[in-house]
Amino acid sequence: MSYRTLLVHLDDSPRCRVRTDLALDLALDLARRWDAHLIGLYVVCQDLLEPLRRPGEPLELGVHERLTEQRRKAAEQQFLKAAEAAGRAVEWQAPAGAPSHTVIRHARHADLLLLGQEDPDDRLSHVAAHFIEDVVMGAGRPAIVVPRAGRVSSCGENVLIGWDGSREAARALADALPLLAHAKLVDVVTVESLHSDPDRTPAGVDVAAYLERHQVRAAFSTVPRERAAGAGETLLDRATELHADLLVMGLYSHTRMHERMLGGVTRTVLGKMSIPVLLSH
């Protein structure tokens, strides 16, 4: 089992460089194992009103179009230059169309996606509302979300798996196997639920046994859920304690509307993450 096609979403935000660097690092690693193909997919916000609200920019549509083209060329040059320096042949695509639908369409023939965490303080990084969730759910492919702050020095060496027994968690576990096979440390963590049913939730020991049959050695534990913190914050705290460099979890155990209206583990993690997160649905 392997990742043979890696697709990274690129935009014109300042944090885009982090995704490019991480994508190439991962691509080189994957290439050594499976000769993975890397695609840079440049898709930006196409809502004309959103870019025109950006502070310090002229409001003339013609000027905006020229700036948009300049940013596209700059992103392409950055991506291709980094790939050349790394000695990798890559593919560049900049299709037109509605952002979410365009990325979903291209993502469906990739093995793994790389997306960037939304940054509420960076208007240039806005692509579409709930972009990450919609892409992962619509494409049916796993995605590694890169944090907007800090520096990613490693990804997949020390992995924490958030396990709640859901189909989404099971999907994420299976989708992460190519990475888990090369991890140095793997921890399966279950956050105690207020209404847990041990008869219906596979225990961490069973998940560890499943991974063992894939030649992945994993530890397992159950951590208490503090009253003041939800399951998402508890997982992130545990990841910090274990010095994890990748969190693997399912996207939306509740309905999408429930998560968007009331919040949930997914929204908490996507908002507060400081390490890469592999999401799958």
Outline where the language-model segments fall.
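Hydrophobic alpha-helical segments and helix pairs
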Residues: 89-150
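Short, flexible loop segments at boundaries between secondary-structure elements
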Residues: 271-281
